[in-house]
Amino acid sequence: MFKRIREIKEKEQEELVRKISELLALERELERKLEELLREYDRKSQSVNTLNEIFKLKAITRKIEETVDYLEELNVKKEELKEKYLELKGEIKSIEILEERKKREKIKKEIAVSLQELGFMHLVKKIIPVFFMFFSFLFSESATQKALKDSINLKEDYKVLLKLIEEKLKKLEEERKKLEALQKTPLTEEEKKKLEKLIKSVEKAPADEIAPAIENLPPKLAAEILLRIKERKAGQILANMNPQKASEIMKYILERNPSFNAQVD
């Protein structure tokens, strides 16, 4: 819709430019004619001896006045057209801004959809429960130790604690293995296509806008994306990230590609 409106406005602008150019050409022609009339008037007014010469001088005067009036009319029309041209220019600029906003929103939407389709966040969801389990394990251990100190039957409570620790460690080990297997699972052809689509969207998006989304991904995944785009663009994205996050991602990037050189304009 915006494109069609902009094209119509641009055609109107071109037509105004054409009309203004025609007026300027006509204005130059009239100014040249006025100069000739003024020179002729000066020449003839030097010696006016007959009635016929007086009439000729009046005729030249009338032509000068008509030319001056015509020039004033042209100037008014020219200013009106210039004003319309500036208005159109402002309207076109506004439409271009709206087009750019729409384009950016589309890119953001494509990236969001691609991220969902690839399921990158499922790794984060896998990692979070492991952390919760780890901390709950620490807290439960601390509470049990306190109970053991206050308890009469230390031996029995100690057995309970050992069993609890073993169960927690076993669950942690299972989660660790699942996470490692998930990370090592190769992408399917469909996932590869979706990844390529995401990378194209990242390349089109402004670095300052896409950086927050990339830095919130697991560092390895963020590194995989940045390794697949141009180094200059990757450098711009890293420059707009939290320094600590950027440093973590760079470690993975350099492990994969030691010669990586992120250039920032």
UniProtKB/Swiss-Prot annotation:
Xref: Gene3D superfamilies: 1.10.220.30
Coiled-coil portions: 143-205
Keywords: Coiled coil
Organism: Aquifex aeolicus (strain VF5)
Key word Coiled coil present: yes
Keyword Coiled coil among UniProt keywords: yes
Protein's name in the database: Uncharacterized protein aq_1680
